[in-house]
Swiss-Prot record:
The amino acid sequences of the N-terminal DNA binding domains of TnrA and GlnR are highly similar, and both proteins bind to DNA sequences with a common consensus sequence. In contrast, the C-terminal signal transduction domains of TnrA and GlnR have no homology. SUPFAM superfamilies: Putative DNA-binding domain (SSF46955). Under conditions of nitrogen excess, the DNA binding activity of GlnR is activated by a transient interaction with feedback-inhibited GlnA. Under conditions of nitrogen-limited, GlnR is autoinhibited by its C-terminal region. The gene is glnR. Pfam families: MerR_1. This is HTH-type transcriptional regulator GlnR. InterPro entries: DNA-bd_dom_put_sf (IPR009061), MerR-type_HTH_dom (IPR000551), MerR_fam (IPR047057).
Length: 129
């Protein structure tokens, strides 16, 4: 499921309670601690996304493992940072300015001037002439 679909607000708190086996008070408590951020309707009702439900289930699992709120916050923060690092790494696959300068410098050294053909072009051109 795409990320934009997973973050769409769909579920009222009653459905989330059934899905997670958490009480409304527990869910509101996690919201107060900024662990989940449900969207509010015009009538001020909470609507939770798939991501919110996943996070609540993860919180429940961490509680079952014996972690307290501070530990849960650390685990979720580390997981979020790791996810962001992966996204940043994927986005920065482009060539850096330093690498680009090095490639251009090498190319200019091979050609000597802008008007001459590079050695690479010369090597390739012999196959076509």
């Amino acid at each position: 499921m795409k990320e934009d679909r997973r973050s769409a607000p769909l579920f009222p708190i009653g459905i989330v309670m059934d899905l997670t086996q958490l009480s409304a008070r527990q869910i509101r408590y996690y919201e107060e601690h900024n662990l989940v951020s449900p969207t509010r309707t015009k009538g001020n009702r909470r609507l939770f996304s798939f991501n919110d439900v996943d996070k609540l289930l993860e919180i429940k699992d961490l509680l079952d493992q014996g972690l307290n709120m501070a530990g849960i916050k650390q685990v979720l923060l580390m997981k979020e940072n790791q996810t962001e690092a992966v996204k940043v790494k994927e986005e920065t696959k482009e060539i850096s300015k330093t690498e680009l300068r090095k490639i251009l410098r090498d190319e200019l050294q091979h050609t000597g001037r802008f008007n001459r053909t590079s050695l690479r072009q010369g090597d390739i051109s012999r196959f076509f002439h």
